[in-house]
Regions:
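Hydrophobic alpha-helical hairpins/lids featuring a short glycine-rich hinge
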Residues: 126-161
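N-terminal, positively charged regions that mediate nucleic acid binding
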Residues: 9-49, 54, 61-67
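Globin-like tetrapyrrole-binding proteins
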Residues: 164
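Glycine-rich, N-terminal phosphate-binding loop and its surrounding beta-alpha-beta segment
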Residues: 48-51, 55-60, 64-138
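A short glycine/serine-rich beta->alpha loop
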Residues: 20-26, 86, 149-152
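Conserved small/polar residues in nucleotide/adenosyl-binding loops
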Residues: 167-168
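Acidic, low-complexity proline/glycine-rich segments
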Residues: 4-7
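Short coil/turn connectors at secondary-structure junctions
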Residues: 13, 17, 76-79, 115-119, ...
Length: 168
């Protein structure tokens, strides 16, 4: 622990809690909206394919219950990078989705500091790895037969929310 943290006098008990919050127009908010829009488009397309009875060339039918999406987006000056692992039978145009979100937010001119029509959009999305799929589809406890608790049966992959606190 740093000396700076040790020197903070405790208030209302002896812990320090911190969190991040960003304001309107922050690149993190734009990035989250792009990732959400990619997932929404994939789910909508997968449902459409499922209703049509689509079966992929590898013999796997479209099924919205089988969609897995770990989509992360980075937004910086003039550039959007969308990356991650996705399991779906659907194809969506990531570049079009990203530009549409940016346009809807209002970044449609270079004089605004970001232009939906001229920014670079890179899609680095690939198929979900078997290792990640294993952890998402079935929890470790399910795979080893060590639990029957319904909560413990749910797989989690590599996603999680962290909450950190410090106590004296």
């Amino acid at each position: 622990m740093s000396e700076e943290l040790r020197s903070i006098p405790p208030k209302h008990g002896s812990f320090v809690f911190t969190s991040e919050s960003v304001t309107e127009g922050h690149p993190d908010k734009i990035a989250d909206q792009i990732s959400d829009a990619v997932l929404d488009a994939i789910l909508a397309k997968e449902i459409e394919l499922q209703e049509q009875g689509y079966i992929a060339p590898n013999g796997v039918p479209a099924n919205v219950e089988n969609v897995r999406c770990a989509c992360e987006t980075l937004v910086t000056t003039g550039t959007v990078i969308v990356a991650g692992e996705i399991r779906t039978q659907a194809y969506v145009d990531v570049q079009e989705i990203a530009r549409g979100v940016i346009r809807r937010i209002g970044y449609n001119r270079a004089k605004f500091g970001f232009d939906c029509d001229t920014c670079g959009v890179m899609s680095l999305i690939h198929e979900q790895s078997p290792d990640i799929a294993q952890g998402v589809d079935e929890s470790f406890e399910t795979q080893t037969g060590t639990t029957t608790d319904p909560i413990d049966l749910i797989g989690a992959g590599d996603q999680g929310m962290m909450s950190v606190s410090y106590t004296h």
